[in-house]
UniProtKB/Swiss-Prot annotation:
Ranges annotated as biased composition (Basic and acidic residues): 344-353
Subcellular location: Golgi apparatus membrane
Coiled coil: none
Membrane-crossing segments per the record: 30-47, 62-79, 126-148, 152-171, 180-202, 222-244, 251-273, 307-326
MF annotations from Gene Ontology: antiporter activity; GDP-fucose transmembrane transporter activity
Annotated keywords: Golgi apparatus, Membrane, Sugar transport, Transmembrane, Transmembrane helix, Transport
Membrane topology: Multi-pass membrane protein
The keyword Endoplasmic reticulum appears for this protein: no
GO cellular component, one term: Golgi apparatus
Region Disordered: start-end pairs: 334-363
PANTHER family given in the database record: SOLUTE CARRIER FAMILY 35
Keyword Transport attributed: yes
Protein's name in the database: GDP-fucose transporter
């Protein structure tokens, strides 16, 4: 009888520990999620930089198109595997022409976003990549007001002014070091605008795919496969690919496919990090990751930067971090007294409408 009671007690303790994980288990989950986000995000930027600048293939749109192809394949494959074997959960991926047409306006913005992101990375160094696209927050505020009619607090606008100052200082100091590419800066500004528009239009069309971000990812990339074809033709990339001397090189295709896998995984690890922490912590992690990425790039490429160049990076990072903090306070104030379900919904909308980090880093 005593042994039976001890067994029941042990079973109860095991069930309670499973339902209420210890602090250490929670810490492990957070550390693993944040580490995965950093590894895939930083790895994707360096890998794309290599593909865009070091393999002697002048076809940035083709590289982006292929990564979209990998994403579509992975979405369909995981959906079929999930349905057939039930080893994990992944949403169904029905290919519907009606849904594809409804998502098309967003897909046009999506194609512009991933194209300008990669074109910016092609012409600027990894160390300047974050500053080069740092106006996303500013465009997000402007577009939210012009398109949705939503006003932003004076404190948030002050943070945007700080970001603009840091961006201009960064451009100036990049010129001082002799590594400034005006083409790259222009593509960076256009990428920032596209990311802001992408976040807004994502909210508008999300209901068309049943509020499923994975399904939206599949349709966006599926539409992109078609939209990229005339762009590649106009840019003369079919000939560049056909005459590429490493076209049948296994290593090249492994790296290309790995870039697509990393881009796909960014969607998962971003959601995982948010789930393990919070939208605010996710944004702070993204800002810290950008700082680490900048330092790593300077060391990896043996670059020499001025004190003012580093100051520009700090100003942009500080402005972005303060903007996140200010917006979080605004959301907390709005959510005070609201139900937990309403708070969760607000956090989701805030995530979609913020800087679009997930989207811009997934390419």
């Amino acid at each position: 009888m005593k042994l039976h009671e001890e067994n029941n007690k042990a079973l109860f303790e095991a069930m309670r520990n499973r339902e209420n994980p210890t602090k250490w288990e929670s810490y492990k989950q957070v550390i693993t999620a944040v580490s995965a986000y950093w590894v895939f995000s930083i790895g994707l930027v360096f890998l794309n930089k290599y593909l865009l600048s070091s393999v002697q293939l002048d076809a940035p749109l083709f590289i982006t198109w292929y990564q979209c192809l990998v994403t579509v394949f992975l979405c369909l494959f995981l959906s079929k595997t999930s349905k057939a074997y039930g080893l994990f959960k992944f949403p169904s991926m029905p290919i519907d022409a009606k849904i594809s047409r409804e998502v098309l306006p967003l897909s046009v913005v999506f194609v512009a976003m991933i194209s300008f992101n990669n074109l910016c990375l092609k012409y600027v160094g990894v160390s300047f990549y974050y500053v080069g696209r740092s106006l996303t927050t500013v465009f997000n505020v402007v577009c939210t007001y012009l398109i949705l009619g939503q006003k932003t607090s004076g404190q948030a606008i002050g943070c945007c002014a700080l970001i603009i100052f840091g961006f201009l200082l960064g451009v100036d100091q990049e010129g001082v070091t002799g590594t400034l590419s005006y083409t790259g800066v222009i593509f960076g500004v256009l990428a920032s605008l596209s990311v802001a528009l992408n976040a807004i239009y994502t909210r508008k069309v999300l209901s068309s795919v049943g509020d499923c971000l994975w399904r939206l990812t599949m349709y966006n990339n599926l539409n992109a496969l078609v939209l990229f074809l005339p762009l590649m033709l106009f840019n003369g990339e079919f000939g560049a690919v056909f005459y590429f001397d490493k076209l049948f090189d296994t290593t090249f295709w492994i790296l290309m496919t790995l870039g697509g896998v990393f881009g796909f995984m960014m969607g998962y690890v971003t959601g995982w990090q948010i789930q393990a922490t919070s939208p605010l912590t996710h944004n702070i992690s993204g800002t810290a990751k950008a700082a680490a990425q900048t330092v790593m790039a300077v060391v990896w490429y043996s670059e020499l930067k001025t004190l003012l160049w580093w100051t520009s990076n700090f100003v942009v990072l500080f402005g972005s971090g303060m903007y996140t903090y200010v917006q979080k306070r605004v959301m907390d104030k709005k959510n005070s007294g609201a139900s937990p379900a309403s708070e969760a919904k607000s956090d989701k909308v805030k995530l979609l409408g913020r800087d679009g980090n997930a989207a811009e880093e997934s390419v």
